[in-house]
Design a protein with these regions (language model features):
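Asp-based, Mg2+/Mn2+-dependent phosphohydrolase catalytic module
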Residues: 35, 39-42, 56-160
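Pocket-edge positions in alpha/beta enzyme catalytic cores
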Residues: 3, 26-29, 82-83, 144
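N-terminal-biased segments
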Residues: 1, 48, 63-66
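Short, acidic loop-to-helix structural element flanking the phosphoryl-transfer center
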Residues: 21-50, 56, 60
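Residue-level "hotspot" positions that anchor or transmit function at local structural transition points
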Residues: 29, 50-51, 82, 99
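Short coil/loop linkers at secondary-structure junctions
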Residues: 4-5, 29, 69, 101
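Conserved acidic
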Residues: 7-8, 26, 86, 110
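A metal-dependent, Asp-based hydrolase signature
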Residues: 1-22, 32, 40
Length: 160
């Protein structure tokens, strides 16, 4: 859309640098309902995992800053996965490591590629929009669309 000369890599690197500087100064912003959602899952003995393309060191740093690291039984970084999202590999790896069938898992996602990966893994997904909308074809693959993590406990109750 911007042409072959568009310096995507340079701009993306600058964006990462600015984001890292912001987080260094202000900390990681918690999504509304994060702690309540994780406390609900823990109270219902629902296993939680992180499956992110972010480097493992950074994932752990963010989870520690948010004081939520103990809620997660597994943290899976895309660094250790050959093919990233939208391929299903990261989600299938998490299911395998946890001994869970994909049909018995749920993916909470805010990105189109994450939702595509969940669909490719045959894992029901919940889309919680962030800053970017997703294409209509991806929306069709979503089990539920919620406005925030505050709504996740009620959605999970529907499955019980």
């Amino acid at each position: 859309e911007y042409g072959e000369d568009f310096p995507y890599e340079q701009i993306y690197a600058e964006k990462r640098k600015l984001a890292a500087a912001y987080i260094e100064e202000h900390g990681v912003p918690a999504k509304p309902g994060l702690h309540d959602c994780l406390a609900y899952a823990q109270s219902r003995h629902i296993c939680c995992a992180v499956a992110s393309s972010t480097p493992l060191v950074r994932i752990r740093q963010y989870l520690e800053q948010l004081a939520v690291l103990p809620y997660f039984e597994l943290i899976q970084s895309g660094e250790e996965i050959e093919r990233g999202k939208p391929f299903p590999d990261i989600f299938l790896t998490v299911c395998s490591k946890l001994g869970t069938e994909p049909a018995n898992a749920i993916v909470l996602e805010d990105s189109a590629n994450g939702l595509r990966a969940a669909a490719a893994a045959a894992i029901p997904s919940v889309w919680i929009p962030d800053m970017v909308d997703i294409p209509a074809d991806v929306k069709k693959t979503v089990w539920k669309e919620l406005h925030s993590l505050l709504e996740v406990p009620a959605a999970l109750e529907e499955l019980r």
